[in-house]
Amino acid sequence: MRFIHALLLAGIAHSAYASEKLTFKTDLEKLEREKAAQIGVAIVDPQGEIVAGHRMAQRFAMCSTFKFPLAALVFERIDSGTERGDRKLSYGPDMIVEWSPATERFLASGHMTVLEAAQAAVQLSDNGATNLLLREIGGPAAMTQYFRKIGDSVSRLDRKEPEMSDNTPGDLRDTTTPIAMARTVAKVLYGGALTSTSTHTIERWLIGNQTGDATLRAGFPKDWVVGEKTGTCANGGRNDIGFFKAQERDYAVAVYTTAPKLSAVERDELVASVGQVITQLILSTDK
């Protein structure tokens, strides 16, 4: 009798979970219709197992979200002793491209340290600092090689900034899928890809990101711990990837959207709305 009772309870729980996932999908499809958008979402646990998703295997332009795994590659080089965080990277005015606030600020000195460039790339989305790091690691091909090394067979970087943010429809260059990137986030933060010191530093940078107050974290409860890296592309691309801790559970998340008919502010609001849909799912399934 107890066995039958347990089976009934398990069946009820499974049915409730399936219902919440259906609501998750329905809510995202409604947003897509209302905003004339495509929305890709993947939420995974620390082991990379899927919690929920939508258009998970569809390719989207990475935009600046790749700057998080780029920083992870830099930390891996530091951890292995092939790089030093305090090494000075010399550069000139040719390194200043569109949106390079920190690179411009350090130009008078003629250099940034490796860690200064990595932090600027993550927290400010500084394109000049990003290109400086790409120069040091061996270019976009080295970034793609790192993706492969940590088990991501999908994500690819082909160009530097700002060209990699063109987001031309049908162009496979500089793209990823939500599930590939969510699992890359999980691998970096929870899978032992970096030392604990490096992991803690990059988590702190993500939590202190200065470009994402209006995106995912705007749609999450204030008591969740959230760290993220945004991305903006031409042709309506607005993305956000990272991690969140809800009710003592850790998750990695990747959200990629394309909404060419919306304004920049409306695209931020769209990503925040996706955050609200994710919140509803997590709070319902964690009861």
UniProtKB/Swiss-Prot annotation:
- State the superkingdom: Bacteria
- Signal peptide as annotated in the record: 1-18
Q: Its Enzyme Commission number?
A: 3.5.2.6
User: What does the record give as the reaction this protein catalyses?
Assistant: a beta-lactam + H2O = a substituted beta-amino acid
Give GO terms for biological process.
beta-lactam antibiotic catabolic process; response to antibiotic
Q: Which SUPFAM superfamilies match?
A: beta-lactamase/transpeptidase-like (SSF56601)
Q: Which UniProt keywords apply?
A: Antibiotic resistance, Disulfide bond, Hydrolase, Plasmid, Secreted, Signal
**Anything known on activity regulation?**
Inhibited by the beta-lactamase-blocking agents clavulanic acid, sulbactam and tazobactam, via a covalent binding to Ser-64.
**Where in or outside the cell?**
Secreted
Using the UniProt record, name the top-level EC class of this enzyme in a single word. Answer: hydrolase
Q: What else is known?
A: The class A beta-lactamase family has a specific amino-acid numbering system, sometimes called Ambler or ABL numbering and often misspelt as Amber. A multiple sequence alignment was used to derive a consensus sequence and then the consensus was numbered taking into account insertions and deletions. This allows use of identical numbers, e.g. for active site residues, despite differences in protein length. UniProt always uses natural numbering of residues, hence there appear to be differences in numbering between this entry and some papers.
Name of this chain's protein: Beta-lactamase GES-5
Q: Which organism is it from?
A: Klebsiella pneumoniae
Q: Which gene encodes it?
A: blaGES-5
